[in-house]
Amino acid sequence: MSKEEFPSEKNLDKEENTSKPKKAVKKEAAKGEETKKNNENQKLAKEIADLKEKNKDLEDKYLRSEAEIQNMQNRYTKERAQLIKYESQSLAKDVLPAMDNLERALSVEADDDVSKQLKKGVQMTLDALVKAMKDHGVVEIEADGVKFDPTLHQAVQTVAAENDDQKDHVVQVLQKGYQYKDRTLRPAMVVVAQ
């Protein structure tokens, strides 16, 4: 037998050493790949859970933002309607002192024909102004003889009531009050019986 037919002890050791580790290496490699896959799967599962949580937060923020925008639009619509409804309020409030002055001018006695004609012109001017104010929603607050209402009347003075029916009622109007649509422009200044 030649040397080639019988492997030497050294060669046998090499073959045995190489054949065992190959199986072990394959097992370890398979185990390593499995561990690597498990780690990757865990990472991916964690990433998916994080993304789902982030998506949930973003969806919540989106819904809240959408609701806030809707609320802002509703508030804007209401405010705009209020502005349109009460756009003449400041003008009406500014005209009230002029109406008061015209009424004071009418309370003066007219002695001669010129004064009477002047008074008649002032009355016509006041009537036209009152009509224009009514046409735009400004009306005088009823005060004389009615029950005192703090939302419409301002009590400037109180007097003793002559009878029980007169208690808490307006007995004298010192200055007329006016309402514009459903708002009080100026409360009537009144004397109330107690």
Curated annotation (Swiss-Prot):
Ranges of Basic and acidic residues composition bias in the record: 1-19, 26-44
Location in or out of the cell: Cytoplasm
Transmembrane regions listed in the UniProt entry: none
Family: Belongs to the GrpE family.
Keywords from the named record: Chaperone, Cytoplasm, Stress response
Taxon lineage: Bacteria, Bacillati, Bacillota, Bacilli, Lactobacillales
Main location: cytoplasm
A GO BP annotation: protein folding
Subunit structure: Homodimer.
GO molecular function, one term: adenyl-nucleotide exchange factor activity
PANTHER family: GRPE PROTEIN, GRPE PROTEIN HOMOLOG, MITOCHONDRIAL
Database matches in Gene3D superfamilies: 3.90.20.20, Head domain of nucleotide exchange factor GrpE (2.30.22.10)
Domain of life where this protein originates: Bacteria
Any Gene Ontology CC annotation: cytoplasm
Keyword Endoplasmic reticulum: no
Native organism: Lactobacillus acidophilus (strain ATCC 700396 / NCK56 / N2 / NCFM)
InterPro entries: GrpE, GrpE_coiled_coil, GrpE_head
PROSITE patterns given in the database record: GRPE
Region Disordered: start-end pairs: 1-44
Keyword Cytoplasm: yes
Protein name (database record): Protein GrpE
Gene behind this protein: grpE
Functional note: Participates actively in the response to hyperosmotic and heat shock by preventing the aggregation of stress-denatured proteins, in association with DnaK and GrpE. It is the nucleotide exchange factor for DnaK and may function as a thermosensor. Unfolded proteins bind initially to DnaJ; upon interaction with the DnaJ-bound protein, DnaK hydrolyzes its bound ATP, resulting in the formation of a stable complex. GrpE releases ADP from DnaK; ATP binding to DnaK triggers the release of the substrate protein, thus completing the reaction cycle.
